Curated annotation (Swiss-Prot):
This is N-acetyl-gamma-glutamyl-phosphate reductase. GO terms for molecular function: N-acetyl-gamma-glutamyl-phosphate reductase activity; NAD binding; NADP+ binding. It is found in: Cytoplasm. Pfam families: Semialdhyde_dh, Semialdhyde_dhC_1. HAMAP family: ArgC_type1 (MF_00150). Belongs to the NAGSA dehydrogenase family. Type 1 subfamily. It comes from the Archaea. GO terms for biological process: L-arginine biosynthetic process.
Length: 340
């Protein structure tokens, strides 16, 4: 690009905001213009994100939306669910582009209101920013970044769903503690989680709605979709096991052919063979996928691994940003994981 993208982050003090800062500070086409926090205004950003010491000298601000719009070409919303809709209308009242990392615009409005129990105040549409399924994000000014669990689950099943081969889909996902956010909860409190696995919201997790929405867009006849999450005692990563019961028996070779074709030219989806590892994707924007066919039971077991803060959140947002500004989608993101 001839000019730098002037980017701002609203809600920069949490894990997602911090990961946006970490990735953007070294992006060759981005100038970080502002990072907002109402409670930390005036304090150095590096005072809360210590790993960024020496990499940026920004201080937290709390400017009005008109000023943010005037200063930024792009704004990332890293705010709680139910608050993104309070920012979007004014931010989009001009040429500023917006990527919303909250859930506010991911779902159809009636579904959102039912799942989140919040009355939606801004019924505009956004592209669901899972680039591997929605390349049209490149033409948009407003993108709804997908949730972390749905990213791993949808990518694990999309090729078979698009082929119309799935009868029943059952997703079992395990996430690191950072998925619960920066404020401790009962499930993320160390004494409760150490040497433990904590399942929660066994049949009614709100991310199921995104999984259903996207897989049924690929196959309108697919209706039997289940999802159960667990928290595990690691900091980053989501490991998803998808039990995909198929309409006809498939071999592992059949599955590999379908997945290789579907993800051809999708640089952030890798099919390395074997069982995907969280350590192989930690700190990166990759989604690693493995699979094995259980031909006797018309079942395909698909495994996916992502970093919940990168491909599951901030990295995926930057992948969308790259396309929205005419850049190669790997720009600033093509780095290996931090294994071990």
């Amino acid at each position: 690009m001839n000019t730098m993208i002037k980017a701002g982050i609203i809600g920069a003090s949490g894990y997602t905001g911090g990961e946006l800062l970490r990735l953007l500070v070294s992006h060759p086409d981005v100038s970080l213009e502002l990072a907002t926090s109402r409670s930390l205004a005036g304090k150095p950003v590096a005072s809360t994100h210590r790993h960024l010491e020496g990499f940026l000298d920004l201080k937290y601000e709390n400017p009005g939306l008109e000023e943010i719009r005037e200063r930024c070409d792009l704004v990332f919303l890293a705010v709680p669910h139910g608050t993104g809709m309070n920012y979007v209308p004014e931010l989009l009242d001009g040429s500023t582009k917006v990527i919303d990392l909250s859930a506010d615009y991911r779902l159809d409005i009636p579904v959102f209101e039912k799942i989140y129990g919040i009355k939606h105040s801004d019924p505009r549409n956004a592209v669901y920013g899972l680039v591997e399924l929605h390349p049209e994000a490149a033409r948009e000014y407003f993108v709804a970044n997908p949730g972390c669990f749905p990213t791993g689950a949808i990518l694990s099943a999309a090729p078979l769903a698009a082929a119309g081969l799935i009868d029943i889909a059952v997703f079992d996902s395990k996430t690191g503690i950072s998925g619960a956010g920066i404020s401790p909860t009962e499930t993320s409190h160390y004494p409760n989680l150490a040497e433990n696995i904590v399942p929660y919201k066994l049949t009614a997790h709100r991310h199921r709605a995104e999984i259903v929405q996207e897989l049924t867009r690929l196959d309108g006849n697919l209706r039997n979709i289940s999802f159960t999450p667990h928290v595990i005692p690691t900091i980053r990563g989501i490991s998803t096991t998808a039990h995909l019961f198929t309409k006809e028996p498939l071999s592992t070779e059949d599955v590999r052919g379908i997945y290789e074709e579907f993800y051809r030219d999708k640089p952030f989806v890798r099919l390395p063979g074997g069982v995907p590892s969280l350590t192989a994707v930690r700190g990166s924007n990759f989604c690693d996928i493995g699979f094995e066919a259980d031909k006797e039971n018309n079942r395909v077991v698909v495994l996916s691994a992502i970093d919940n803060l990168v491909k599951g959140a901030s990295g995926q947002a930057i992948q969308n940003m790259n396309l929205m500004f005419g850049l190669v989608e790997t720009r600033g993101l093509w780095t290996p994981a931090t294994a071990p």
